[in-house]
Amino acid sequence: MKYAVKMPKVLQAVYPKRLWSINTADKVVYLTFDDGPIPEVTPWVMDTLANFNAKATFFCIGDNVRKHPDIFEQLIARGHRVSNHTMHHVKGWKTPLVAYLREVDSCQNLMELEAGQEIHKLFRPPYGQLRSKQAKALQKKGFQVVMWDVLSADFDTALTPEACTKHVIDNAQAGSIVVFHDSKKAWPRLKLALPEVLKYFSEKGFAFKCIP
């Protein structure tokens, strides 16, 4: 499995309209969680974040919102940001433009229906896969495409929790957007890595905020 834990600057420069990190001098890290909400993991994530007075951005799969609206509503009630991760976690490189936009719109409409309010238009493409035409069409619809600059790689079953923790501690800095997953696949690594990351950066004087 090939991926970059620290997103190369050259790749960020190629796609400057995508959000890779937040330009700030403040000691803030932006934690993000992909693929929820699910009852097995997401409530624990919320409780763990609360122990450190931390807020985060959750990129939700629409079908999981449909299945677990109560957990989705808890995310909003507890001050986290909920954002779009398509309806069914589709791959951008294999999905035609019209079908891809339908996936995004369906997720956005469902979230707004469940929330009873407008949802800020942040979008993260599943697997990080997004064609230029898809990105341009989403931007025309008012979406900010959010990528990341640090990957915990908690999805990688070959890794130990300690390795995932080290990925974040060694690479995150002020303004970093960090990826975790509130999924059953990531859980064996997430349950140990997330508290350690929160503890480490809290002791360094960092705060954890939602992506604005």
What label would you give each PLM region?
Residues 73, 100-104, 159-166, 191-195:
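Charged helix-capping and loop-helix junction motifs
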Residues 42-43, 69, 97, 135, ...:
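Conserved strand-to-helix beginnings and helix N-cap segments that scaffold or border functional pockets
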Residues 2-93, 99, 106, 110:
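Active-site beta->alpha N-cap acidic-glycine motif
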Residues 46-55, 81, 97-129, 136-140, ...:
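CE4/NodB-like, metal-dependent polysaccharide N-deacetylase domain
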Residues 30, 57-59, 83, 124, ...:
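Structural detector of well-ordered beta-strand residues that form the stable sheet scaffold
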Residues 60-65, 88-91, 128-129, 151-155, ...:
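Short histidine/acidic/glycine/proline-rich micro-motifs that form metal-
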Residues 14-24, 51-53, 66, 188-212:
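C-terminal domain-boundary segment and adjacent tail
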Residues 129, 134-171, 205-212:
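His/Asp/Glu-enriched short active-site or ligand-binding loop at hydrolase and phosphoryl-transfer sites
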